[in-house]
Structure formats: structure tokens, C-alpha cells
């Protein structure tokens, strides 16, 4: 189960850092081929350089789907390269109904064998049900995302005067989490909102993107959510260098993100 593997990796590596494996062909180091094979080489080098620093890896489905069947194979090879004791969280943001949702769930959990997935709640419970029924898998549901456009919908006020994203958090915590396999996606760019969500629903793990390139502050996130925060960093680590020493550079950046966490636990 994702959370068990996450807790074990977080303890052994003294880290709640999740590295997003979002390989952009245009940004691969110059010596690597700009194709699916290059992506696999790139990802494997990043994984080898950072596997003792992370609590999870999060491949983003879109970067692999864009390459067709070769990209799908690259995704499977990437997942196979991740040490078995480190959980894999698929960033897919799925959200559909009926047999379509069932097919998405089967693709993620059976074909790819990932431990967790991100989901969109916009279509309601039945669009999430095929995922939530898999009690051995964890579902991170979009709640307060780090992109500025999230305000267009997530910050709409309901009749009780509270924003929609808090209703999403309530639904997840009180109605959709019967298998205790739910978490929320909350952006690091909104630490006050993270604190509110964590105070109301402290049992929910929080996947927190937006640290690094998007401007989120890791110390503010840890102050708001503590041990429940899974800090995702992608571009800042992946593209720390465009040269042949890119993996070593990625490791140094990843290590820098560990300092606040270690300071928090070991004053």
C-alpha cells in the first residue's frame, strides 16, 4: 500500500521529498537522444542519483502519452527502474464515469502497477469509485491546486460562505475515504489554505506540488502540514544541469530540499 511504503521510505531516507518524473524532450541533456529511449536513460539516471533521498516518485502521464506507444513503454521501463520499496504515484488526474473510469483504474493499477494516482473530483463520486474501491491503492484528489487559474473554480464561495475547495476536502474526508486510502493535492503556493485543510482533516496525507520553480516555500508547507506533507519537486531537480553531470546536479538540488525537513525533526 502506498502509505505504508511512503512511511517506510520517509523514515529510512529521512525525507518527505517526492520527485516528479516529468521528462520534457526539449530540456533533456544535450548528449541524450530526444526520444523515448532518451527519456528512459534520463529517468534512470535521476532515479539512481536520488533514490536514497526520496519518499516517492511521481511520473506525469502526459509526458509519456505524448510519445505514443514508445512513450507508454518508456513509462513502464521507468516504473520498473524505481526500487520496489519506494512508492510510485502516477500523476494522471483522471476523472470520468462508468466503464471509462474502470478502464483508467485498471490501466494504472493493473497494467502499470503503480501504488497511487491523482484524480479530479469534478464529476463526483462515481467517477472516483473504481479507484477508491482499490483499498490497497491510494488516491490523491485535486483540492487546492498551485496554478493561478485554480481560483476560477476552487475559490468560488458556497452558500455557507466557504470556498469550494474546502467542500472537496470535506467530501474526501467524510464521505469518500471509507477505505482510508484518500489524500488531497494542495499547492505549496497556498500555505494558509494548506494549514486550514490540515487542521480540519489531519488524517489526510497531502501531496504538495509547487515548491521550487513555481515559488512555493518548503518551510511554510512543513509548518502548515508537518508529517502529512509529501513535497513534490520536479523541474528544479530534473533540470538542475543540462550537461553530462545532470544526475549529480539533480542530487545536489534534491539534498537542498531535505535541509528544512531534517532541521524540523532534529533541532
Curated annotation (Swiss-Prot):
<dbReference type="Pfam" id="PF00215">
    <property type="entry name" value="OMPdecase"/>
</dbReference>
<comment type="similarity">
    <text>Belongs to the OMP decarboxylase family. Type 2 subfamily.</text>
</comment>
<dbReference type="InterPro" id="IPR001754">
    <property type="entry name" value="OMPdeCOase_dom"/>
</dbReference>
<dbReference type="InterPro" id="IPR011060">
    <property type="entry name" value="RibuloseP-bd_barrel"/>
</dbReference>
<keyword id="KW-0665">Pyrimidine biosynthesis</keyword>
<protein>
    <recommendedName>
        <fullName>Orotidine 5'-phosphate decarboxylase</fullName>
        <ecNumber>4.1.1.23</ecNumber>
    </recommendedName>
</protein>
<comment type="pathway">
    <text>Pyrimidine metabolism; UMP biosynthesis via de novo pathway; UMP from orotate: step 2/2.</text>
</comment>
<dbReference type="InterPro" id="IPR011995">
    <property type="entry name" value="OMPdecase_type-2"/>
</dbReference>
<keyword id="KW-0456">Lyase</keyword>
<dbReference type="InterPro" id="IPR013785">
    <property type="entry name" value="Aldolase_TIM"/>
</dbReference>
<feature type="active site" description="Proton donor">
    <location>
        <position position="93"/>
    </location>
</feature>
<dbReference type="GO" id="GO:0004590">
    <property type="term" value="F:orotidine-5'-phosphate decarboxylase activity"/>
</dbReference>
<dbReference type="InterPro" id="IPR018089">
    <property type="entry name" value="OMPdecase_AS"/>
</dbReference>
<dbReference type="GO" id="GO:0006207">
    <property type="term" value="P:'de novo' pyrimidine nucleobase biosynthetic process"/>
</dbReference>
<dbReference type="GO" id="GO:0044205">
    <property type="term" value="P:'de novo' UMP biosynthetic process"/>
</dbReference>
<keyword id="KW-0210">Decarboxylase</keyword>
Amino acid at each position: 500500500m502506498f502509505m505504508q511504503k511512503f512511511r517506510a521510505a520517509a523514515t529510512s531516507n529521512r525525507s518527505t521529498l517526492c520527485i516528479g518524473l516529468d521528462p520534457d524532450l526539449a530540456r533533456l541533456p544535450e548528449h541524450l537522444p530526444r526520444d523515448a529511449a532518451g527519456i528512459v536513460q534520463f529517468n534512470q539516471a535521476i532515479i539512481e542519483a536520488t533514490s536514497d533521498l526520496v519518499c516517492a516518485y511521481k511520473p506525469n502521464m502526459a509526458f509519456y502519452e505524448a510519445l505514443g506507444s514508445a512513450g507508454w513503454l518508456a513509462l513502464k521501463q521507468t516504473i520498473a527502474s524505481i526500487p520496489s520499496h519506494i512508492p510510485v504515484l502516477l500523476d494522471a488526474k483522471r476523472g470520468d464515469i462508468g466503464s471509462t473510469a474502470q478502464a483508467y483504474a485498471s490501466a494504472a493499477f493493473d497494467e502499470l502497477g503503480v501504488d497511487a494516482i491523482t484524480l479530479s473530483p469534478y464529476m463526483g463520486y462515481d467517477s472516483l469509485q473504481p479507484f477508491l474501491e482499490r483499498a490497497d491503492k491510494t488516491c490523491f484528489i485535486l483540492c487546492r491546486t498551485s496554478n493561478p487559474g485554480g481560483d476560477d473554480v476552487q475559490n468560488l464561495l458556497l452558500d455557507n460562505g466557504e470556498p469550494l475547495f474546502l467542500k472537496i476536502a470535506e467530501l474526501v474526508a467524510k464521505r469518500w475515504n471509507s477505505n482510508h486510502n484518500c489524500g488531497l493535492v494542495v499547492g505549496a503556493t497556498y500555505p494558509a489554505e494548506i494549514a486550514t485543510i490540515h487542521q480540519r482533516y489531519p488524517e489526510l496525507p497531502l501531496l504538495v506540488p509547487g515548491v521550487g520553480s513555481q515559488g512555493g516555500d518548503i518551510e511554510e508547507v512543513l509548518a502548515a502540514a508537518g508529517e502529512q506533507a509529501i513535497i513534490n519537486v520536479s523541474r528544479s531537480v530534473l533540470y538542475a544541469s543540462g550537461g553530462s553531470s545532470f544526475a549529480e546536479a539533480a542530487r545536489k538540488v534534491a539534498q537542498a530540499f531535505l535541509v528544512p525537513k531534517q532541521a524540523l525533526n532534529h533541532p
